[in-house]
From Swiss-Prot:
The keyword Lipid metabolism applies. This is Undecaprenyl phosphate-alpha-4-amino-4-deoxy-L-arabinose arabinosyl transferase. GO terms for molecular function: 4-amino-4-deoxy-L-arabinose transferase activity; mannosyltransferase activity. Keywords: Cell inner membrane, Cell membrane, Glycosyltransferase, Lipid A biosynthesis, Lipid biosynthesis, Lipid metabolism, Lipopolysaccharide biosynthesis, Membrane, Transferase, Transmembrane, Transmembrane helix. The chain crosses the membrane at residues 7-27, 81-101, 111-133, 137-154, 165-185, 204-224, 255-275, 288-308, 315-335, 346-366, 382-402, 406-426. Its EC number is 2.4.2.43. GO terms for cellular component: plasma membrane. Pathway: Lipopolysaccharide metabolism; 4-amino-4-deoxy-beta-L-arabinose-lipid A biosynthesis. It catalyses: 4-amino-4-deoxy-alpha-L-arabinopyranosyl di-trans,octa-cis-undecaprenyl phosphate + lipid IVA = lipid IIA + di-trans,octa-cis-undecaprenyl phosphate. It is a multi-pass membrane protein. The lineage of its organism: Bacteria, Pseudomonadati, Pseudomonadota, Gammaproteobacteria, Enterobacterales.
Amino acid sequence: MKSVRYLIGLFAFIACYYLLPISTRLLWQPDETRYAEISREMLASGDWIVPHLLGLRYFEKPIAGYWINSIGQWLFGANNFGVRAGVIFATLLTTALVTWFTLRLWRDKRLALLATVIYLSLFIVYAIGTYAVLDPFIAFWLVAGMCSFWLAMQAQTWKGKSAGFLLLGITCGMGVMTKGFLALAVPVLSVLPWVATQKRWKDLFIYGWLAVISCVLTVLPWGLAIAQREPDFWHYFFWVEHIQRFALDDAQHRAPFWYYVPVIIAGSLPWLGLLPGALYTGWKNRKHSATVYLLSWTIMPLLFFSVAKGKLPTYILSCFASLAMLMAHYALLAAKNNPLALRINGWINIAFGVTGIIATFVVSPWGPMNTPVWQTFESYKVFCAWSIFSLWAFFGWYTLTNVEKTWPFAALCPLGLALLVGFSIPDRVMEGKHPQFFVEMTQESLQPSRYILTDSVGVAAGLAWSLQRDDIIMYRQTGELKYGLNYPDAKGRFVSGDEFANWLNQHRQEGIITLVLSVDRDEDINSLAIPPADAIDRQERLVLIQYRPK
């Protein structure tokens, strides 16, 4: 009976965090709008081989992540939940692997349940796992690969080992088709310390070739298909998206070596108090094969991405699967022997909640700031933000009431965040970062437009997805569409600032022309170097400028 209650509680937990509130949050640009539009165009065109954005070739990533996103929109429709359904599904599948692997290592159902809840409630897992990017997909394939490798190395028969390595190759192949060749590097780096300490080189060399073969066979059908359709895809994807992105001096998202230290700290909330003890206990028990495996799984990718020049928080998402297992194991030991770390965790959550309450007041209309984040008419959003941090502090306090038994309730600290964050976003943020909000405010003006031009790829993708059209024209800036715009058949999809006046004269009689520009809050629209417009509608950071036929 207790198991049934736990199962019902887990489903309720998942519903409150990962299902019910998702539709209340508008899509963020540039990431969510980009992936939403790529998948919408895939469904509309029926082209499941070559990814396109705004009707242009888009070679930033391979295809598998777009497939899953497209299936989400096909099943649930072109709405906020449909766009995020794929990443939520991937996050829940990863959670299932965490549950299974914990059971496999320790044969303890309670420990497996705790690892599950810890993983689902980690701030970084929740933030990325409900955000429509490709990282939850690659995290799933990496976690599946680590589970497959362990399964292979623990098998006692050649059939079991062969099956495990074949499965490893499939997961690596799907990882390559999701985000590229890092899906090969990360698992190899993660298992090498364990293989070395356990002296399992023989099995690796005997059966490893099976993983290579299954990986190649997994990638080969699509790899050949896109090479035939677009011969320069692999050249661009390998050199630009891998070498330049991570290794060269002009790598994207450059950051210092220590970049991931604050990411790990913030990402570990509301379980930050368990982080030092989990890592230390894991190191102290490094003679235990499973502990070494989890430590290597956590630390090696972290070191790899720290050395790389290009860094983003999303890159280390897969590390938190193993970290959640280490945390759950350590938490049970602490609850039994010395609950000091659990008390510290409770106080950290209280401090975080109280700090958030104070910070919310400071940036509210009633605080000391001359330019508050929220305006007076947005008072309900301020109260939503206060509620988020109040619930965080409350559950932090509750875990201290009988810490040996109540410490798992720290998983409820982010409950307010999950339920209310969509209602607390300030209008000034929504107007710049949520194109849906802009479209809603300017729907009547946008719909009849013959041409729509914009200077932001993220805004362009948001307009295209909301209006169900892929013919948005880039104005002045090409951004990440630069490569796709270089193709001969992309002529006319970009208009420079110097060419705009002539272009306007040539196309004005064809219908309404709408220009959507991103501007600074204090920027004077009249100073823009554009021809006089027939209508101007400013929505904080975005401005709609229209030209009608004469």
